[in-house]
């Protein structure tokens, strides 16, 4: 028997599966099929689009589509599947058993500020409301299946290592990052946020045994993927707390990181509840010290701040108040703000701000601005600030309440964030910072855009023409609002062209032409250019790995 999995990509509060990320869903689904000795082929939805494979799957026994976006996002590595595309795939491939799984079964929308619409059941044999791997584990050998059943970690321990094999079929293999599953559900016991789908999708909070997690990481590393993110957790810092009366589990984290680093070239994380940081300050600082000791620089702990408006926080059952959020940001900066040899901060907070929530007023936008200005004034670093409009899904309080949308104010706030993010990026990635192994993903004219493998990697525009998926090191020279500009590193003035030289701030086209005409250059001080240009050129050549003012 043969099955094909179409990865339509997922993005949820506690999981990301848009390339270069690969979600546990597709790996577990493959593992369940492999367990029953069913051959599996794997395609991303982008491969289907690019190669026009819409009616290429009739010779399979199973056609499985996995997808679902329950938080709004903008993606560089791929575009999540649409309902139209799901219907197209199922209608053009009549022969296989057609199975749909992932959070898309809870509803579909790709745009913030919109309520989700239900999936059309036509052309689908099984819409799996539970966990897709549980259905695929039971159905091939038994009629005793339940489309609402959830997996437990005993099942995951059987199938997860087997599913690692599917990664070799990913079009970007081995330059992908495996989203690792540490826990499911939310550990909060005082209710859930009004908008969050994690309790709907994953149910009651439970934690994966550390030994099983490490076995899967080894299996993934053995197939050639060495990049990992501890992203499949609503609050990563609470991992192991069930074994420690709800408190941070310092010995478990020490074992997790000291073992995981044996398999990893990139080791990053994602979600952290700032309220948990405040509640357990001293223990959390010890956890952060462990992370910073072993992780890869550029790491982020994403905070669900959602709003600095206390009224909005209360009405939406968000777990953190504004002053506590600021304190949590300080704590992560204190421990994680150190930089590696390339000038990249080891671990910084990220902030999620959500609009369209219950109790929001026009003043909410001004309150958020005031708190953001405090962060800037205190010289605190925030790696990224996601500003989004909430998606409303059936089963959430937000879907029931349907609050008023302030679209005009939201647009103005987004404009404000352009200048704010520009200033913050200059602090996080000063001129001279080195980015190793940037993978080119898009070429626009004379600029090649790429990202590193990691958690929310910064979009980097490198002056020059490279090949798609080519890797290069880069040195930062300038900053936008959501991206940075860089030159190939190490910077070689005698091989630099006019486009590269004129991209350096303060060096225009005329100065760049003078430099080119002066080649070969052996002494910067003898160049007939102004002193500011000389200092910048000297800095890039001699001090590329040292962070200092130019």
Residue positions per predicted region:
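Conserved SAM/AdoMet-binding glycine-rich loop
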Residues: 3-6, 218-350, 355-360, 374
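Glycine-rich beta-alpha loop elements in corrinoid/cobalamin-binding modules
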Residues: 42-155, 437-438
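Catalytic cores of alpha/beta
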Residues: 110-118, 283-287, 358-376
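Canonical Radical SAM [4Fe-4S] cluster-binding loop centered on the CxxxCxxC motif
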Residues: 172-212
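Terminal RNA-binding accessory module
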Residues: 407-491
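Alpha-helical interaction/regulatory segments in DNA maintenance proteins
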Residues: 517, 528-550
């Amino acid at each position: 028997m043969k099955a094909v999995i179409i990865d339509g990509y997922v993005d949820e509060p506690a999981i990301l599966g848009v390339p270069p990320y690969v979600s546990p869903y597709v790996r577990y689904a493959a593992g369940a099929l492999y367990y029953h000795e069913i051959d599996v082929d794997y395609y991303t939805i982008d491969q289907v689009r690019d190669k026009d494979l819409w009616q290429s799957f009739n010779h399979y026994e199973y056609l499985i589509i996995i997808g679902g976006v329950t938080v709004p996002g903008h993606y560089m590595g791929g575009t999540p599947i649409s309902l139209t595309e799901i219907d197209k795939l199922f209608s053009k491939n009549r022969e296989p058993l057609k199975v749909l799984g992932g959070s898309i079964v809870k509803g579909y929308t790709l745009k913030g500020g919109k309520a989700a619409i239900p999936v059309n059941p036509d052309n689908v044999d099984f819409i799996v409301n539970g966990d897709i791997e549980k259905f695929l584990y039971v159905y091939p050998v038994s009629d005793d299946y339940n489309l609402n059943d959830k997996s437990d970690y005993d099942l995951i321990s059987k199938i997860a290592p087997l599913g690692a094999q599917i990664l070799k079929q990913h079009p970007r293999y081995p330059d992908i990052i495996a989203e690792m599953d540490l826990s499911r559900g939310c550990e909060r016991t005082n209710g859930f946020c009004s908008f969050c789908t994690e309790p709907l999708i994953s149910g009651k909070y439970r934690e994966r045994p550390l030994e099983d997690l490490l076995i899967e990481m080894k299996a993934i590393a053995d197939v050639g993927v060495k990049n990992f993110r501890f992203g499949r957790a609503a609050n990563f810092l609470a991992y192991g707390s069930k074994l420690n009366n709800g408190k941070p589990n310092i010995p478990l984290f020490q074992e997790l990181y000291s073992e995981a680093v044996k398999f990893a070239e990139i080791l990053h994380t994602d979600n952290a509840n700032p309220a948990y940081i405040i509640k357990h300050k001293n223990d959390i600082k010890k956890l952060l010290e462990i992370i910073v000791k072993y992780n890869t620089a550029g790491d982020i702990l994403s905070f669900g701040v959602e709003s600095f408006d206390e009224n909005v926080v209360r009405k939406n059952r968000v777990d953190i108040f504004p002053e506590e959020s600021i304190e949590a940001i300080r704590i992560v900066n204190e421990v994680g703000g150190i930089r590696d040899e390339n000038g990249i901060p080891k671990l910084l907070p990220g902030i999620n701000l959500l609009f369209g929530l219950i109790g929001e007023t026009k003043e909410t936008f001004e309150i958020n601005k005031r708190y953001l200005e405090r962060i800037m004034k205190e010289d605190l670093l925030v790696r990224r600030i996601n500003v989004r409009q909430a998606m409303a899904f059936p089963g959430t309080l937000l879907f029931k309440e349907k609050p008023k949308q302030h679209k005009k104010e939201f647009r103005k706030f987004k404009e404000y964030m352009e200048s704010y993010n520009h200033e913050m990026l200059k602090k996080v990635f000063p001129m001279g910072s080195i980015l190793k192994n940037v993978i080119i993903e898009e070429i626009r004219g004379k600029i090649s855009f790429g990202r590193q493998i990691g958690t929310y990697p910064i979009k980097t525009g490198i002056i020059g023409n490279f090949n798609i998926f080519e890797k290069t090191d880069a040195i930062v020279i300038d900053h936008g609002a959501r991206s940075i500009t860089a030159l190939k590193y190490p910077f070689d003035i005698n091989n630099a062209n006019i486009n590269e030289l004129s991209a350096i701030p303060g060096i225009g086209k005329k100065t760049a032409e003078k430099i080119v005409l002066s080649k070969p250059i052996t002494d910067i001080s003898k160049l007939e250019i102004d002193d500011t240009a000389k200092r910048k050129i000297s800095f890039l050549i001699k001090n590329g790995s040292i962070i200092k003012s130019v």
